[in-house]
Amino acid sequence: VLACTMAVFTYAQKSDGIVYWSYEAGYHFDFDLDGKIDLTVPTQTKDVPIAEVFVYDANGDGYFDLCEVDRSCAADQLIHWRFYYNDGNNNFIDPQDVVYGMAVGDKALSADFNGDGAGDVAIRRDNEYGLWWLMHFMAMAPDVNLAFGISDNDYLLAGDMNNDGQADVVLYDRGNWLCSFTPSTTEYKTPDFANQDIANMQFGTKNDIPLLLDFNGDGYDDMAICSVNDEEVSVNLRDPATKPENNGYSKSGRGSFDKTFYMPSGLKPTCVRGVKLSKGGTGLS
């Protein structure tokens, strides 16, 4: 497993960090959002090109793990989800390969959707039957097979938008946002897409990379957009006091640019993710 390089600093804030990734450059973590790189980890899968990554706690131990999406397998033409688990010191070990979804055409999303501490995988298949979701859960739960989306251009995101400890499905299409909160009171706590809890709201443009992170430590993920050309990240904070719509995310149909900060200079990420540090778990001393 490939090693990482790190800076030494003291982490003392409650907000999430951000990771900027590209296949060639690997993962660049900015834990305290000061525009400086705190940890560098190479892309773990080196034998094949990786299409995208997800960074979250996929085994319930409190440390962020890596999930690298491999669409290159010509033999079975399926998506191979390659999980690498953090040992607590940012060494990524015990790789696990999950095969789910078609390599060509299916959109990919990975998160803990039912709050059981295990990472789950989901694909969305856009065809004549609609914007169709298929979800597979690592633990005992019935799979999801339901339609939900804005358009076939949707960018798939997952974040805790209602502070219940499990990931909700969030979609972004050229500045438009849509979200359905995962029910946390049902037996299996799996997405049912019955409600559009965030819908018809605007924040960002078609040129931005969307991401979700809890910027202010209130337990709710906030919406953010990364402008790679400007090397900036702008955040729309959840604030029910000033944003009465969409469960505290918009006013008059729009989010607001509440916070803007710089990303580390010189990076050209193709994927940007928020990183939760539930144990203060940067792995740094």
Question: Residues of each region from the PLM?
Answer:
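Bacterial N-terminal signal peptides
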Residues: V1-A7
